[in-house]
């Protein structure tokens, strides 16, 4: 069966690589906003075994799909990087683990800085797919999901 990521990619196959990655990030936010990261998921993210398994899935499965999309972006001229595989792996690890307050506890200011750094990093290596709007939506979603754990109101 197709993964959710594969389905999203097939729905956006007429777009440039950059547009595809941006669309996937937006769809992922919409999906999470609707029903993702409930109490069960939040609890799991505190389990070292679950986090390791999640990181391995990011690198061993999801990164290949993202890398292929980056390669497409290189071919169509919308993205420029010499390291599509490594870029995909690092992006997924930082976005899904380092920027997840359930894994690495932080306040809203620190999370905002992490997201801005990730945006800067991706832009500096030629994969400028994190718009300011996307960052704000991500921050808003994470604040909504993790209000208690993260102590955003401090």
What are these regions (language model features)?
Residues 1, 24-28, 58-62, 66, ...:
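Hydrophobic/aromatic residues within well-ordered alpha-helical segments
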Residues 6-13, 37-43, 75, 100-107:
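Short, flexible helix-adjacent loops and helix caps
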Residues 64, 68-71, 107-154:
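C-terminal peripheral helix-coil segments that are non-catalytic and often amphipathic
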Residues 3-38, 88-91:
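Hydrophobic alpha-helical connector segments
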Residues 62-95, 99-106:
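Hydrophobic alpha-helical bundle segments that form small-molecule/ligand-binding pockets
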Residues 27-32, 57, 94-101, 124, ...:
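Phosphate/oxyanion-binding loops and surfaces in catalytic or ligand/nucleic-acid-binding neighborhoods
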Residues 33-78:
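Short secondary-structure transition hinges
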């Amino acid at each position: 069966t197709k993964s959710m990521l594969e389905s999203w990619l097939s729905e956006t196959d007429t777009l440039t690589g950059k547009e595809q990655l941006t669309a996937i990030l937006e769809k992922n936010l919409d999906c999470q906003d609707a029903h993702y990261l409930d109490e069960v998921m939040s609890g799991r993210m505190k389990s070292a075994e679950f986090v390791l398994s999640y990181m391995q899935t990011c690198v061993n499965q999801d990164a290949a799909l993202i890398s292929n999309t980056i390669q497409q972006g290189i071919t169509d001229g919308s993205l420029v990087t010499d390291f599509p595989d490594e870029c995909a792996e690092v992006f997924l690890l930082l976005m899904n683990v380092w920027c997840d307050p359930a894994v690495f506890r932080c306040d809203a200011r620190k999370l905002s800085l992490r997201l801005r750094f990730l945006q800067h990093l991706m832009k500096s290596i030629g994969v400028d797919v994190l718009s300011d709007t996307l960052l704000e939506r991500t921050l808003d979603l994470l604040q909504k999901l993790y209000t208690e754990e993260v102590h955003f109101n401090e």
